[in-house]
């Protein structure tokens, strides 16, 4: 019924570009952990309405294949992927800018558009928003802790039950950076035009160093073990041995399958009064530069894929997490997990999307490992990370 209404609306109101006359094909790539079957169903409905065949594929090593194939003038017309590679691909000439109209801009969260902004232009259409948060077992935690000082106290109170308060993959920047960012750290500063500037780094601000000290204190106090990994965190939480973990919406299904009644809250603050700021990841669709059907790709995305009716079909296949579309989010906001994740995202910062972002992940992962293993002080480790990010 939903599909029929969408098809009728498009057939009556949408004038497809002249290119669309004839046996044309629109090729879409998306990662294999997303709702590609739902996306294909949306494409099939578009094909019935337009006469343009839509083929959805989910290749292995999709980003490598995208770069290789598009660089050779082949590959998909549309590539749906998180925003953090957009700057790299824009600089390499692999994708083209998009120019959504005022109405479409207003239908989608501003922060989601901002994630796809690079050098003053937009390079993708947002579908869904992800942000990591504190996932807590309600049977063990009545009120989620606001600070990591509270976490240390909670860990002591759980000792009698032979439980641990928290675990996360703390040597990975994606999961630990929020506590440093909340304390005043930043990845890259901005130039006079508001663009991220790789020559300005803020991973070693005084606040970031204080947050690094808190991470070390969590280790030395015994609240966190040394050398934890993601799999240990997830399995411990599923068994009810760990009260809280730091992860994203992708971890919800496993917790549900384990019959854990859980809540989602902001990551505790390293410094009181300085809330953590999670990285925000935005799944979106980009148009490949070599595509010969760019107008059709835009028509499909803007007037079909981004509509709530189509997003519902994809979400029914594999949950999108938090929809970037405001109207569809409003429908799902009754779910406390989705509502909490949106609030976390609204107070977070988009993961950097410039080509130089790779320097941050490499340097910061090494710094976190040096801190948690006791190889370097937080000050020395973060100063070293800043120096590596600035090295040419």
Predicted regions and their residues:
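Glycine-centered hinge/linker elements that transmit conformational signals in sensory
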Residues: 155, 197-227
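Extracytoplasmic/periplasmic substrate-recognition and gating elements
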Residues: 22, 44, 49, 122, ...
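Conserved N-terminal structural module of periplasmic/extracytoplasmic solute-binding proteins
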Residues: 16-88, 271-273, 380, 384-392
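Mature extracytoplasmic/periplasmic domains
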Residues: 95, 250-253, 283-358, 379
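Conserved C-terminal helix/tail region of periplasmic/extracytoplasmic solute-binding proteins
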Residues: 343-392
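Hinge/lid segment of periplasmic solute-binding proteins
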Residues: 83-132, 143-154, 179, 263-265, ...
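Extracytoplasmic/periplasmic solute-binding protein
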Residues: 123-127, 132, 152-200, 242
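A structural signal for short loop-to-beta-strand junctions that line the ligand-binding cleft
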Residues: 76-77, 105-138, 165, 274-277, ...
């Amino acid at each position: 019924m939903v599909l029929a209404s969408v098809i009728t609306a498009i057939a009556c109101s949408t004038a497809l570009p002249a290119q669309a006359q004839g046996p044309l094909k629109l090729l879409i790539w998306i990662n294999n952990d997303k709702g590609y079957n739902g996306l294909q169903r949306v494409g099939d409905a578009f094909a019935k309405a337009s006469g343009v065949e839509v083929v959805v594929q989910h290749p292995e090593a999709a980003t490598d294949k995208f770069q290789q194939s598009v660089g050779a003038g082949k590959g998909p017309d549309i590539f749906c992927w998180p925003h953090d590679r957009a700057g790299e691909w824009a600089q390499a000439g692999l994708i083209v800018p998009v120019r959504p109209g005022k109405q479409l801009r207003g239908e989608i969260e501003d922060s989601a558009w901002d994630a796809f902004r690079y050098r003053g232009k937009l390079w993708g259409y947002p579908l869904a928003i992800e942000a990591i948060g504190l996932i807590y077992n309600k049977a063990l935690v009545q009120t989620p802790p606001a600070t990591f000082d509270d976490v240390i106290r909670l860990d002591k109170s759980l000792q009698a039950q032979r439980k641990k308060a928290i675990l996360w993959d703390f040597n990975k920047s994606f999961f630990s950076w929020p506590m440093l960012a909340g304390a005043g750290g930043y990845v890259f500063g901005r130039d006079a035009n508001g663009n991220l500037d790789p020559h300005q780094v803020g991973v070693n601000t005084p606040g970031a160093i204080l947050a690094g000290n808190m991470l070390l204190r969590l280790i030395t106090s015994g609240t966190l073990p040394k050398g934890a990994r993601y799999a240990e965190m997830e399995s411990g939480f599923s068994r009810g041995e760990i009260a809280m973990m730091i992860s994203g919406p992708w971890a919800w299904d496993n917790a549900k399958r384990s019959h854990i009644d859980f809540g989602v809250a902001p990551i505790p603050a390293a410094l009181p009064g300085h809330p953590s700021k999670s990285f925000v990841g935005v799944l979106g669709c980009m148009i490949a530069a070599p595509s010969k059907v760019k107008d059709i790709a835009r028509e499909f995305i803007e007037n079909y894929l981004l509509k709530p009716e189509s997003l519902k079909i994809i979400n029914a296949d594999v949950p999108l997490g938090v929809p970037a579309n405001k109207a569809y989010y409003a429908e799902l906001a009754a779910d406390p997990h989705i509502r909490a994740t949106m609030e976390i995202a609204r107070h977070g910062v988009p993961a950097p999307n410039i080509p130089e972002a790779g320097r941050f992940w490499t340097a910061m992962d090494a710094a976190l490992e040096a801190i948690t293993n006791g190889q370097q002080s937080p000050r020395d480790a973060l100063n070293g990370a800043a120096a590596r990010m600035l090295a040419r």
